[in-house]
């Protein structure tokens, strides 16, 4: 077409019948991502009002550092746990095309911001972790039954009860005779007694209870794969603050460690982990 530059609207468009509709919040992020893929861009610059992703929530940690480089996989882990700068749907179009995203600040245009790169990128920061994120508002269904590990289909039956009631589970730590299911409080609202009754009928546990007021805190970073003792440092940071860990989960990718703690300990736990991995290395 001979055009060097094209300006397109990012937050509204036309429906199939020609009506103009505005997109939901973050819609322009998605538009930019789709256009970047369509023109096979070398990079997608997303200009916003922050200088990239921060290692921790600035409402909890004072003046947290900016993440210089983050992979798509790390970003998804942090976004799932509540870290938000870029609309989640804006990631997929450029991720599949291998196009990096640069988050930049319109109010501070000289700041390099954060580069979001492919998952096989070997570039790492000077820190073991990439980011810390978490959410409150979870509960745990704790079950105990003798010889649980020998009972065929126990887990399937419990999860079937949750599915029948439209309840999604987040994590499921277990032992030989114990099992806990971490669930969003919002999903359980108005369903708790019905779910417990159906679980009792399905698997007849020796003991079952619901523990409320749980927060989940995720420590994410590809640097953890090549660093020994990361989990030990997380636990030590919390132990020194006398914070009790209710649940531990680590994926096989070694990309993240998730701990369950009391909601009242959420802010302090975040600060202690940040101090352990960021402030202590400076």
Write out the residue ranges for each language-model feature.
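C-terminal catalytic "cap/lid" subdomain
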Residues: 1-282
């Amino acid at each position: 077409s001979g055009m060097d530059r094209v300006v397109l609207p990012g937050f509204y468009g036309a429906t199939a019948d020609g009506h103009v509709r505005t997109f939901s919040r973050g819609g322009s992020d998605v538009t930019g991502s789709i256009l970047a893929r369509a023109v096979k861009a070398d990079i997608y610059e997303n200009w916003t009002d922050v200088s990239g992703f921060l290692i921790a929530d600035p409402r909890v940690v004072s003046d947290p550092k900016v993440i210089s480089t983050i992979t798509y996989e790390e970003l998804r882990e942090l976004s799932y746990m509540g870290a938000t700068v870029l609309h989640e749907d804006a990631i997929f179009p450029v991720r599949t095309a291998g196009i990096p995203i640069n988050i930049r600040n319109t109010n501070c245009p000289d700041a390099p911001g954060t580069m979001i790169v492919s998952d096989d990128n070997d570039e790492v920061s000077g820190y073991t972790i990439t980011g810390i994120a978490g959410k409150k508002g979870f509960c745990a269904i704790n079950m105990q039954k003798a010889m649980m590990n020998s009972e065929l289909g126990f887990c399937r039956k419990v999860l079937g009860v949750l599915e029948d009631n439209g309840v999604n589970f987040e994590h499921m730590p277990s032992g030989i005779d114990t099992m806990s299911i971490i669930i969003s409080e919002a999903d359980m609202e108005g369903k708790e007694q019905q779910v417990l009754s159906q679980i009792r009928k399905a698997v007849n546990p020796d003991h079952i209870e619901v523990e409320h007021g749980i927060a989940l805190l995720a420590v994410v970073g590809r640097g953890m794969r090549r660093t020994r003792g990361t989990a030990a440092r997380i636990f030590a940071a919390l132990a020194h603050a006398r914070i009790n860990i209710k649940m531990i989960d680590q994926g096989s990718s070694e990309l993240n460690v998730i701990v369950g703690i009391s909601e009242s300990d959420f802010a302090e736990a975040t600060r202690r982990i940040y101090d352990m991995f960021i402030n202590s290395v400076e």
